[in-house]
Amino acid sequence: MIYKFNIRNLRMIIMKLVKDALSRSDTTRYLKDEFGEARIVVVGCGGAGNNTINRLMEIGIQGAETIAINTDKQHLEVIQADKKILIGATLTRGLGAGGYPEIGRKAAEMAKNILEEQLKGADLVFVTAGMGGGTGTGSAPVVAEVAKENGAIVVGVVTYPFKIERARMKKADEGIARMSEVCDTVIIIDNNKLLDLVPNLPINDAFKVADEIIAQAVKGITETIAVPSLINIDFADVKAVMSGGGVAMIGVGEVDSSDRGDRVQNVVRETLSCPLLDVDYRGAKGALIHITGGPDLTLKEANDIGEGITKELDPEANVIWGARIDPEMEGCIRVMAIITGVKSPNIVGKDTKPKRIIPKVSKEQSQRKERKIGGIDFIV
């Protein structure tokens, strides 16, 4: 008996053979690795930024690379990060920026070639730093600018100093103003609001709370993009909300099994009334809502939380939300809402001009040097 192929059958067989061959080839593996996955990088600048990177490494983060940058060699050596870069080695001799943002800026500019190499091809870059010091305030805008020039969506995540740190506040205003110029969105954690959130904690522990909030926010956004979740956030959606988002604030809410009543309503109310979110969010341009819950979190609950926060915002606001399951959060729900396009006159918008203070550096000293010692990948 002779079996007759028709054209349609022949095409199907050929396509199947080609598909099977490609599935075993290096080409397909390359395509799977290089396409369809956003490259996310988290860069911590200065002492506070390094501490956030260290905390991220401690709690673990999937789908992102971490880079720690500092002028303080001693601090940098004890930080955990995928890559560590000591900047301004000939400028500061690894001893820090002395609280001068202009030194931090100059140190980062001396390292631009290395920064470009490390950030090339990144789709989303978080730049985290404490505003008001030297290295973070000065270097973070340079890092953000390099990332932006390489085509990434750049999200600054910065802390604003306590009022008792008077010498740092003016520098912080200058740093945030500069970050606002070079980032798509700048998320601000006001340390003064931490006093309302955790009023009885010693100040050193309050700093750790800020590290934890930033680390959890970055981890949450990253893993909801990169890791299969209950409800994934698409990178294109993140880009739409964060691109040109301006100044952003963050609201945090959490409920557990001991909370009485409707836990969905409770966590929505707690998130929007969070002391860190001390702005009029109703006129916000957009929001990114991240929900984490235990295995008992239902799809309906996640949807109701997303809708509950969305309805409180401007009807024209671009809102995206995602949800993921954490086996260790049985009975609990945590929500982080990043509200973009808000106005916070107490922090942003002051007319400030940075004072330029840079020690003189010889031409020989300013030449770039790279080597790996003491766990540091690059010394520049």
From Swiss-Prot:
Q: What is its main location?
A: cytoplasm
- Residues annotated as binding GTP are 47-51, 134-136, 165, 168, 211
Question: What is the name listed in the Swiss-Prot or TrEMBL entry for this protein?
Answer: Cell division protein FtsZ 2
**Coiled coil, from the record:** none
Biological process terms from the Gene Ontology for this record are: cell division; FtsZ-dependent cytokinesis; protein polymerization
In the record, what terms sit under GO molecular function? GTP binding; GTPase activity
InterPro entries, from UniProt?
Answer: Cell_div_FtsZ (IPR000158), Cell_div_FtsZ_CS (IPR020805), FtsZ/CetZ (IPR045061), FtsZ_C (IPR024757), Tub_FtsZ_C (IPR008280), Tubulin/FtsZ-like_C (IPR037103), Tubulin/FtsZ_2-layer-sand-dom (IPR018316), Tubulin/FtsZ_GTPase_sf (IPR036525)
Annotated localization: Cytoplasm
Which NCBIfam families has this protein been placed in?
A: ftsZ
